[in-house]
């Protein structure tokens, strides 16, 4: 059974209306836009009364030969409870992204720039620059390297970006503060039955001397993750 889309993860305590447009501008350009209004008659998480939200999105894409150029902008306005839990305040977030991608026979490159601005009782800004390269020059062997620099005022202006993962998996981690993130992805298909995937990612923060808190606290400004996956087809 299909499931309707919603402002949250599922349709609950919500009604609304959405208008969307997809437009082909000639042979190479496409334009996508939507506007979504949602109303919540009852209280929900961090909102102590009935509320509403607006979500606007605009994206244009240019695709020709081996090149893809994408520009997108999203404006979202929501209501949330204030510190006294007695009233509601408006929270507005703006996100923009510009992506240039090239795909060739053996190499693929992707350059991405993100900017974000969140405004409520305070204003928070941030940006992120990401570069990735993928090589598939040998049969059954593929390698991807990705590096990012991020700088945001705080968690309110965090930036999400796609990162390749193991087979049937991917992630959209959030980055805030200031630092560098880099990752190396390797995949080897050995014959018809064996496949090995390895992923190493490292994040170095410039604005803190520890990461996380409680039992998950890391007492340094850098963290590394290593993932391995081995598959055998019987």
What are these regions (language model features)?
Residues 1-234:
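Exposed, low-structure sequence patches enriched in small/polar residues
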């Amino acid at each position: 059974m299909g499931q309707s889309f919603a402002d949250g993860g599922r349709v609950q305590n919500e009604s609304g209306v959405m208008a969307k447009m997809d437009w082909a501008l000639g042979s190479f350009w496409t334009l996508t836009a939507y506007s979504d209004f949602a109303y919540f008659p009852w209280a929900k998480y961090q909102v102590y009364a009935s509320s509403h939200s607006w979500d606007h999105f605009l994206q244009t894409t240019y695709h020709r030969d081996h090149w893809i150029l994408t520009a997108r902008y999203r404006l979202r306005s929501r209501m949330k409870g204030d510190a006294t839990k007695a009233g509601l305040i408006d929270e507005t977030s703006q996100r923009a992204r510009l992506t240039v991608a090239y795909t060739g026979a053996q190499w693929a490159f992707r350059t991405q720039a993100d900017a974000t601005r969140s405004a409520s009782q305070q204003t928070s800004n941030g940006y992120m620059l990401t570069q990735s390269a993928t090589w598939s020059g040998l049969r059954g062997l593929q390698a991807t390297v990705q590096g990012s620099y991020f700088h945001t005022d705080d968690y309110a202006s965090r930036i999400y970006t796609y990162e390749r993962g193991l087979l049937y998996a991917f992630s959209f981690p959030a980055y805030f503060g200031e630092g560098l993130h880099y990752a190396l992805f390797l995949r080897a298909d050995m014959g018809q039955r064996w496949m090995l995937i390895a992923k190493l990612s490292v994040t170095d923060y410039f604005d803190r001397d520890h990461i996380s808190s409680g039992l998950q606290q890391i007492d340094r400004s850098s963290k590394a993750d290593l993932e391995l996956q081995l598959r055998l087809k019987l």
